[in-house]
Amino acid sequence: MGDVEKGKKVFVQKCSQCHTVEKGGKHKTGPNLHGLFGRKTGQAEGFSYTDANKNKGIVWDEDTLMVYLENPKKYIPGTKMIFAGIKKKGERQDLIAYLKQSTSS
């Protein structure tokens, strides 16, 4: 499991320009991530997803996020997420630990 505080820094640096995490947070370029764990791809209410995201049909958890965050366009070809990914496994683990805490409270 990753370090939540380090993960928060990763989120602020690499994700917060497009995403929010708090309950009731607004969608930006990317969807609000509250309730992410256990939700299927392309299901955040009120966000306009590509068909690729809606049709991927996986459920977000630690394992699916580890693969997705390494290379989003490889995992979901056709996603509109313009992000190259996080190559360092430790950074992904930290980010996922932060997301698990921040998107469920």
Swiss-Prot record:
Recorded GO MF terms: electron transfer activity; heme binding; metal ion binding
Protein name: Cytochrome c, testis-specific
InterPro entries: Cyt_c-like_dom, Cyt_c-like_dom_sf, Cyt_c_1A/1B
Keyword Transport in annotation: yes
GO CC term, one of those recorded: mitochondrial intermembrane space
Binding-site list for heme c: 15, 18-19, 81
Family under the similarity heading: Belongs to the cytochrome c family.
Function: Electron carrier protein. The oxidized form of the cytochrome c heme group can accept an electron from the heme group of the cytochrome c1 subunit of cytochrome reductase. Cytochrome c then transfers this electron to the cytochrome oxidase complex, the final protein carrier in the mitochondrial electron-transport chain.
Keywords: Acetylation, Electron transport, Heme, Iron, Metal-binding, Mitochondrion, Respiratory chain, Transport
Native organism taxonomy: Eukaryota, Metazoa, Chordata, Craniata, Vertebrata
Modified residues (N-acetylglycine): 2
Cross-referenced PANTHER family: CYTOCHROME C
Posttranslational mods: Binds 1 heme c group covalently per subunit.
Classification via Pfam families: Cytochrom_C
Cellular compartment(s): Mitochondrion intermembrane space
